[in-house]
Structure formats: C-alpha cells, structure tokens
C-alpha cells in the first residue's frame, strides 16, 4: 500500500512545525516546498535526522519546484508574509494575493486531486482566491482558522474554570478576524452549558465576555509578544488535525473556512462554520441555529470577509469571473 504524500507549501515557522508533526504522526511522506533555495532542504534534512531518535520512518524532502508536489494527497499552504506588530491580517492582502495566484497555479498543474488546507492570512479571502486560482472543487479546499480559534477559546475557558482542556467544547464561527463569533451558547464543560456555570457561580458573564474578546484578539496577542513573527505551534497542530481527519476518513466535526452555497444565508464566500471532514473533503456543512444576537455578529463577520474578497477582485480583476 502506497504511503500518503503531504506537500507543505512554505517552509517558515508553521511549515517546519507542520513537517515535524506530520512526521511524528507518520501521516505520510513529506515534501517541504519554498521559493527560498536551501531553506526547505535544510529543514527537511534536519527533521529527517531526528527520525532515528523519534522513531519515525517518514521520508522528508525539501524542494523549490512545484513539480515535486506532484501526486500529493494533502497540501497545506502557509506561503506568504506573516503578520508583524501593528499589522492587521487585512494589511497582508495585496502581498499574499500574488502568492496565492502562484501557489494555485502549481496545485492546478501538479496536484489537482489533493485536499488543500490554506493557512495564509487574511485567511477567508486567501482560501477564496486559492480556490479560484487552483480550480479545485470547493469541497477539496478549506481554510484553517476555526480549529485554531476554537482551541484558543477552549484554552482560555479551561484556565478560567481550572479544568482539563479535554473537557471543554467550544467553537468559533465567522471570519478569521476581529469580527469572529466565539459562541458561548454552544460551548460546554463536560456537557454543562456555560450559562449554567454562570448560575453555579463558577464565573460571571463579564468574565466570559472578556474571554470572548481575548479569543478574537488571540493572534494579535502572540504577534505583540513575539515582535518578529506570529503564532506557529497551535496553527500547525490545528491544520494537522484537519489533514488527519481527511487521510483517515475520521469524519470529524471541525470549524473550518468552507465555501457556503446558501447555508447561513451566504453564497460563494468562504466563512468559518462547523463542517464534517472525511475522505471526500468537506462532506457536510453543519448549519446550527443562531439567535438574533449571533445572527447580527455573524452577518458583521461575513461582511468583513465580503469586503476583503471585493478588494481582491479590484487588485486582480481575473478573480471576479
């Protein structure tokens, strides 16, 4: 039985961490691609040399040619410029849009059957542009945002309640930006709704509201602390969870940026919603019921994404077709 092939486009902090996690989990053979000569080769060799210690047998290869991603089963895209202090995700739009055009062309030519996970920011607009440039079916290309944002939300809640993160269930809707919608109503601790925990005196509504706001600003908090880059451990772990769900046909319910076609009243936009990921990619979009407050917040988030997509069309009119 042939091993799966995983291509990682971008050999920066996230790309290197993705390669390490994929190797440790033995998800398949790994190609680390970057336009910077020597960088992917050096990281691939370094990781391969950790194999005898870690006990994994994955093949790792560094590459500067898209031809090396040929036949990939999964492609994870991190290529582009990361955020720096003072930058919004949206400031990256013009720079990273050009990167998505090049990456999409490479995928279209060499790996048109892959399941693609995009991490590049501004996420919802970049995965939309990547779908356009690659020509992949919408079910085979998603954005990694909700798993990460939900993980941050779960971590903050576990810290508040002083319980294991394993017992905290939470998810985040909407775009991957300051207008995201961390859902208190659909979040629980061991099945107990957060509203009940407020009544039990475990926390207050004000403290929960502060956690929601911290979740929205979670990426920026790390950017400001690092000063020279952005988060990479948690984003990489989140994308690997998505890749594993696809490769192992787990049918996991994960919040991802998926293309909507009428769900939540939205058409032809990539927005963060719960989806089922299995061997066919996005197998189902889960349309949860939103109350009036959540609908208003979700609509605001969708409009933010729509604004970015319209800006993409202005920068590159070819995407408007």
UniProtKB/Swiss-Prot annotation:
GO MF annotations in UniProt: L-lactate dehydrogenase activity; L-malate dehydrogenase (NAD+) activity
Active-site residues, Swiss-Prot/TrEMBL: 176
Residues that coordinate or bind NAD(+): 10-15, 34, 96, 119-121
Full protein name: Malate dehydrogenase
Coiled coil: none
Entry binding sites for substrate: 83, 89, 121, 152
Organism, scientific name: Methylocella silvestris (strain DSM 15510 / CIP 108128 / LMG 27833 / NCIMB 13906 / BL2)
Superkingdom, natural source: Bacteria
Keyword field: NAD, Oxidoreductase, Tricarboxylic acid cycle
GO biological process: lactate metabolic process; tricarboxylic acid cycle
Functional note: Catalyzes the reversible oxidation of malate to oxaloacetate.
A Pfam family annotated for this UniProt entry: Ldh_1_N
HAMAP family per the UniProt record, alphabetical: Malate_dehydrog_3
Catalytic activity: (S)-malate + NAD(+) = oxaloacetate + NADH + H(+)
Enzyme Commission code: 1.1.1.37
NCBIfam families: MalateDH_bact, PRK06223.1
Family: Belongs to the LDH/MDH superfamily. MDH type 3 family.
């Amino acid at each position: 039985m042939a091993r799966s092939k995983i291509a990682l486009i971008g050999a920066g902090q996230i790309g290197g961490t993705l390669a390490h996690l994929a190797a440790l989990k033995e998800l398949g053979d790994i190609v680390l691609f970057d336009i910077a000569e020597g960088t992917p080769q050096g990281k691939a060799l370094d990781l391969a040399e950790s194999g005898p210690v870690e006990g994994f047998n994955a093949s790792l290869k560094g590459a500067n040619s898209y031809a090396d991603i040929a036949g990939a089963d999964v492609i994870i895209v991190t290529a582009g410029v990361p955020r720096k202090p003072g930058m919004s995700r949206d400031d990256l739009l013009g720079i990273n849009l050009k990167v998505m055009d090049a990456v999409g062309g490479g995928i279209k030519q060499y790996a048109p059957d892959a399941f693609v996970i995009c991490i590049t920011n501004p996420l919802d607009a970049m995965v939309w542009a990547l779908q356009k440039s690659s020509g992949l079916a919408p079910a085979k290309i998603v954005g990694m945002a909700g798993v990460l944002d939900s993980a941050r939300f779960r971590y903050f809640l576990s810290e508040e309640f002083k319980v294991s993160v394993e017992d905290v269930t939470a998810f985040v809707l909407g775009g991957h930006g300051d207008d995201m919608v961390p859902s208190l109503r659909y979040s629980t601790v061991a099945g107990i709704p957060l509203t009940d925990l407020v009544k039990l005196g475990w926390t207050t509504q004000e403290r929960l509201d502060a956690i929601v706001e911290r979740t929205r600003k979670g990426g920026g908090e790390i950017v400001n602390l690092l000063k020279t880059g952005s988060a990479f451990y948690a984003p990489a772990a989140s994308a690997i969870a998505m890749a594993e769900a696809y490769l192992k046909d787990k049918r996991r319910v994960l919040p991802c940026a998926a293309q909507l076609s009428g769900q939540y009243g939205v058409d032809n936009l990539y927005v963060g919603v719960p989806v089922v990921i299995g061997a066919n990619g996005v197998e189902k979009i889960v349309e949860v019921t939103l109350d009036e407050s959540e609908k208003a917040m979700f609509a605001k988030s969708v409009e933010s994404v729509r604004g970015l997509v319209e800006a993409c069309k202005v920068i590159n009119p070819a995407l408007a077709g």
